[in-house]
């Protein structure tokens, strides 16, 4: 029996950072730092598959903190994510990394929720930062990106934008920072019927 495409109905938000004095070329921050960031984000035992940034309306109100979802995690499972994550080397002049994910929801002419989008943010800083800087920069750039996604589609904003962010001040040679949405539950759209 055929079935249609899958779409997520339950998600969680999370974030993590990692740093190390060790790493393997060509991207040394991908080795140990990335694993440490996944561990801190509590998603280290998944096989991560990245998405682009389109959200079904069924996710509205169903995006939870990661700690509410960990009891449902399955070691070795595939976790589909929207992730803002990057690494850096301090010898390249980066002292801090900030990341964020923002969410917007659109409405139709009657004010009804129709669909959503996400946007990712990554910024490198030549000096250490604090949470206030990380949050303000994430919101500033994500707000611009989310509004662009709505404007591009000629869709009005349904509700307030949501923002999640994270940052690291790199104290070792290499660092990695990530903010992510992970998708846990799914349903299927109706299958296509071609006559």
Swiss-Prot record:
GO BP term (any one): arginine catabolic process
SUPFAM superfamilies linked to this entry: Pyruvoyl-dependent histidine and arginine decarboxylases (SSF56271)
Pfam family membership, one: PvlArgDC
Presence of the UniProt keyword Hydrolase in the record: no
Pyruvic acid (Ser) sites (modified residues): 53
Cofactor mode of binding and number, as noted: Binds 1 pyruvoyl group covalently per subunit.
Entry keywords, A to Z: Cytoplasm, Decarboxylase, Lyase, Pyruvate, Virulence
Source superkingdom: Bacteria
Site residues by UniProt (Cleavage (non-hydrolytic)): 52-53
Reactions the enzyme catalyzes: L-arginine + H(+) = agmatine + CO2
Entry's EC annotation: 4.1.1.19
GO molecular function, one term: arginine decarboxylase activity
The protein's required cofactors: pyruvate
Gene3D superfamilies: Pyruvoyl-Dependent Histidine Decarboxylase, subunit B
The protein's enzyme class: lyase
Cell compartment(s), UniProt: Cytoplasm
Assembly and interaction partners: Trimer of an alpha-beta dimer.
Similarity remark: Belongs to the pyruvoyl-dependent arginine decarboxylase family.
Protein name: Pyruvoyl-dependent arginine decarboxylase AaxB
Organism lineage: Bacteria, Pseudomonadati, Chlamydiota, Chlamydiia, Chlamydiales
Gene that produces this protein: aaxB
């Amino acid at each position: 029996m055929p079935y249609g495409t899958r779409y997520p109905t339950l998600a969680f938000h999370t974030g993590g950072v990692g740093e190390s004095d060790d790493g393997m070329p060509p991207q040394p921050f991908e080795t140990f730092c990335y694993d440490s960031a996944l561990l801190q984000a509590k998603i280290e035992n998944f096989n991560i598959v990245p998405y682009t940034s389109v959200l079904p309306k069924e996710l509205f109100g169903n995006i939870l903190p990661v700690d509410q979802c960990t009891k449902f995690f399955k070691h070795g499972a595939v976790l589909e994510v929207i992730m803002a994550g990057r690494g850096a080397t301090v010898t390249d002049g980066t002292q801090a990394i900030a990341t964020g994910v923002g969410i917007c929801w659109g409405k139709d002419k009657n004010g009804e929720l129709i669909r959503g989008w996400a946007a990712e943010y990554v910024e490198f800083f030549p000096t250490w930062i604090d949470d206030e800087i990380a949050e303000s920069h994430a919101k500033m750039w994500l707000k611009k990106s989310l509004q662009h996604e709505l404007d591009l589609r000629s869709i009005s904003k349904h509700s307030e934008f949501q923002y999640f962010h994270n940052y690291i001040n790199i104290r070792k040679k290499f660092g990695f920072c990530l903010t992510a949405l992970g998708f846990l539950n799914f349903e299927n759209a109706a299958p296509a019927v071609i006559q």
